[in-house]
């Protein structure tokens, strides 16, 4: 056959027949039929030569069934001219597969494309799947595969994109605070900066402090939270009173300072209650008082009551620091703050009415009396018993938990005393002077130029070391029970919002307003 496809007359003779028989197999050959001889006796190398010399347009049409590798596709390749006019109504079904295949390629990549084409039996590449608009099977393709692709994309791509970030955020340690920040400023306004350090977890302990001016509240809170006695006081998280401030008779802390440790313990340091320096500042600087207060000393006392009532509502433990035993006005102040304390919101009216009294639903914190700068004679067992008995009598009518949660006898501070030595043991703890350790480093001498007496023995102090007592106090405070502050369990962030509402309620309290009118 020539390149044009017509037969040549001299090629069907005996010579051609014999020439083809020589290289071929010796099996039987069928020479019957008008075109059977040409179709049966074409050699393989002759077929390759003829295929290469054919028109490229026909070659493209012959390669299509080879790619799809489907015998039925050869029969369907002839009617493209008849289906060509039907192409214009096809764009409507074509738009859906193209748009809905995009999330499959973004979420699953090439795996989604192969997975969608394999069960349908169409061409592997995604662009060729919507090209042939055929019968009913083609019309079902935009609905069923797309529904499966959407589920796979949303079920696998979203978790893989979010889980690593969420997992890393949970594994990261909380941000460590290096110094305290303001929770309530000197103008008695609430500050929102502390919420950045809080987490969504419920295991939190809140410790507050109250005390007169110069008793060492900031130093005690720094030692309990993050510092040690050996560190420089200027590096404490709660700034202690400087020497210049002591000489001027001023106060270092104003408002309420906030600090949270890595153990998720919140410490609240407050300004001194009934402070004469704050009163002097109001009088000498001509600060304008709020309209509801007429006298400066009334305003100072109401500020102190607001802070104390706030701590009694939002703290698990409140430490009352005093540097001498004892000031009766301090206990009178504590009873007044307990009286004007905001009531704890009850879960329902039925439960509060069924209780019959406010004691069952009202919240009261643990109260710890800390005797700072204690002398040697204060650690005498007889003096210790008198102190416990007096505090028990002064706080006999209080609902605050001032006894039963802290004990110096159980800390092995007095190893010779029996556990029942104190008839009425209250939450009292004694801490000596911080500088007493340096004084004991110089042992007594017999004379100016003589050697020290008992140089091989430590000096008698009458009490354990300052570091040991602070460590025992810290362990007891941190191991105290954490009662529920509200009728619902509060996380750290929930506690912050709860405290903000309590502070706003304290400032607008009708009980405090009535008490201020009685003072005037």
Swiss-Prot record:
Record InterPro entries: P-loop_NTPase (IPR027417), SMG9 (IPR039177)
Residue spans of biased composition, Pro residues class: 78-94, 122-133
Q: Where is the composition biased (Low complexity)?
A: 112-121
Phosphoserine PTM sites in chain numbering = 2, 4, 7, 32, 53, 451
Q: How is it modified after translation?
A: Phosphorylated by SMG1.
Has keyword Phosphoprotein? yes
Q: What is this protein called?
A: Nonsense-mediated mRNA decay factor SMG9
Write the gene name. Smg9
């Amino acid at each position: 056959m020539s390149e044009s496809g017509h037969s040549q007359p001299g090629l069907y003779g005996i010579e051609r027949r014999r020439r083809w028989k020589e290289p071929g197999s010796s099996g039987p050959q069928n020479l019957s039929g008008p075109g059977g001889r040409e179709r049966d006796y074409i050699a393989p190398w002759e077929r390759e030569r003829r295929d290469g010399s054919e028109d490229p347009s026909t070659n493209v049409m012959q390669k299509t069934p080879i790619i799809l590798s489907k015998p039925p596709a050869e029969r369907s390749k002839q009617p493209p001219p008849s289906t060509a006019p039907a192409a214009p109504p096809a764009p409507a079904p074509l738009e859906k597969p193209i748009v809905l295949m995009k999330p499959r390629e973004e979420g699953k990549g090439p795996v989604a494309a192969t997975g969608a084409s394999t069960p349908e039996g169409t061409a592997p590449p995604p662009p060729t799947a919507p090209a042939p608009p055929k019968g009913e099977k083609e019309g079902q393709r935009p609905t069923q595969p797309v529904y499966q692709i959407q589920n796979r994309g949303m079920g696998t791509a979203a978790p893989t994109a979010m889980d690593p970030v969420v997992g890393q955020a949970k594994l990261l340690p909380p941000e460590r605070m290096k110094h305290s920040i303001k929770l309530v400023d000197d103008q008695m306004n609430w500050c929102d900066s502390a919420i950045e350090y809080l987490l969504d977890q419920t295991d939190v302990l809140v410790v507050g402090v109250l005390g007169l001016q110069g008793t060492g509240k900031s130093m005690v809170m720094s030692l309990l939270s993050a510092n040690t006695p050996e560190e420089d006081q200027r590096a404490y998280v709660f700034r202690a009173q400087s020497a210049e401030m002591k000489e001027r008779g001023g106060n270092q802390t104003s408002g309420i300072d906030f600090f949270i440790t890595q153990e998720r313990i919140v410490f609240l340091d407050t300004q001194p209650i009934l402070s004469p320096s704050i009163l002097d500042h109001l009088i000498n600087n001509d600060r304008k008082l709020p309209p509801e207060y007429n006298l400066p000393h009334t305003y100072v006392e109401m500020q102190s009551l607001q802070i104390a009532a706030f701590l009694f509502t939002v703290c698990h433990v409140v430490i009352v620091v005093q540097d001498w035993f004892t000031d009766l006005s301090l206990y009178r102040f504590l009873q007044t703050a307990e009286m004007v304390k905001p009531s704890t919101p009850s879960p329902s009216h039925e439960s509060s009415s069924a209780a019959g009294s406010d004691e069952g639903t009202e919240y009261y914190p643990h109260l710890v009396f800390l005797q700072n700068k204690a002398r040697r004679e204060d650690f005498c067992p007889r003096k210790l018993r008198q102190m416990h008995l007096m505090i028990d009598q002064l706080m006999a009518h209080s609902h605050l938990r001032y006894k039963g949660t802290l004990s110096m006898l159980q800390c092995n501070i007095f190893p010779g005393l029996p556990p029942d030595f104190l008839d009425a043991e209250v939450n009292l703890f004694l801490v000596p002077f911080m500088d007493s350790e340096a004084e004991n480093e110089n042992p007594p001498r017999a004379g100016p130029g003589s050697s020290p007496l008992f140089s091989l023995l430590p000096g008698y102090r009458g009490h354990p070391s300052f570091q040991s007592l602070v460590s025992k106090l810290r362990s007891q405070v941190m191991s105290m029970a954490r009662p529920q502050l509200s009728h619902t369990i509060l996380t750290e962030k929930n506690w912050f919002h709860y405290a903000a509402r309590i502070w706003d309620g304290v400032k607008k309290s009708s009980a405090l307003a009535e008490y201020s009118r009685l003072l005037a």
